[in-house]
Amino acid sequence: MSDVLPARFLTPVDLAELLGVPVETVYQWRRKRTGPRGFRVGRHLRYDPQDVRAWIEQQMTVGIA
């Protein structure tokens, strides 16, 4: 997983490309508070790769249970 995620903060477009989902899905997750935790830098939405990794691992655990 660490090989795939960059060492910089991700944009919604980066996250969508990484997960193979439309960008609108990333924004819907944000509105519904179901996706990875994001934060704002001024007007720009960013995602910490560590938070994305934790969210993916959580989704994998939920899918197994």
Residue ranges of model-derived segments:
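Hydrophobic aliphatic residue packing
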Residues: T11-P12, V21, V41, L45, ...
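Polyanion-binding surface elements
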Residues: M1-Q28, Q58
